[in-house]
Amino acid sequence: MSPEDWLQAEMQGEIVALVHSHPGGLPWLSEADRRLQVQSDLPWWLVCRGTIHKFRCVPHLTGRRFEHGVTDCYTLFRDAYHLAGIEMPDFHREDDWWRNGQNLYLDNLEATGLYQVPLSAAQPGDVLLCCFGSSVPNHAAIYCGDGELLHHIPEQLSKRERYTDKWQRRTHSLWRHRAWRASAFTGIYNDLVAASTFV
């Protein structure tokens, strides 16, 4: 969208979303789309093959500050899946829920469309449940392929990291969404590239 078109739209009233199309393309935001969406701080609606795909504006997946229940490992998982076209529910979670007899991941994953798969069958977009300082799986990471994961742990920025022995030992199980298709990782990948080139 040219700056002139943007100004003309603003003169018509409040801009509440940006709508554009990918004729014959993929139903995910491109790298450039994600950079511009984050800059605009607006929902973007993408028309592709006769369907409207609505993307709320979420921060880039890497470089987020950790705040439990607001920007934590579940928020990262939820936002990554949103960019891949799969909506996950948001739910209240108290800090240290795993120390208070709760098992939020195992109690909710199947009900939200995920099923367990063998670790040997891992593919990009699968969700790794890990035990982080706990015997209860209390940490989610997105497997990116090529021995890499995307996650967010306390007191660190969200990041991509090697899936080393340390994380393999902490891994409880691997999960895949019933609506997942391999091409959906494109939505996540495009954000990772956009964030790495964001100036």
Curated annotation (Swiss-Prot):
It comes from Escherichia phage lambda. Zn(2+) binds at H20, H22, D33. Gene3D superfamilies: endopeptidase domain like (from Nostoc punctiforme). It comes from the Viruses. Belongs to the peptidase C40 family. One of its GO terms (cellular component) is host cell cytoplasm. Its EC number is 3.4.-.-. This is Tail tip assembly protein K. The keyword Glycoprotein does not apply. Keywords: Host cytoplasm, Hydrolase, Late protein, Metal-binding, Metalloprotease, Protease, Thiol protease, Viral release from host cell, Viral tail assembly, Zinc. The active site is at C73 (nucleophile), H139 (proton acceptor), H151. Residues 1-77 form the MPN domain. Its main location: host cell. SUPFAM superfamilies: Cysteine proteinases (SSF54001), JAB1/MPN domain (SSF102712). A motif (JAMM motif) lies at residues 20-33. Residues 40-186 form the NlpC/P60 domain. It is an enzyme of class 3 (hydrolase). GO terms for molecular function: cysteine-type peptidase activity; metalloexopeptidase activity; zinc ion binding.
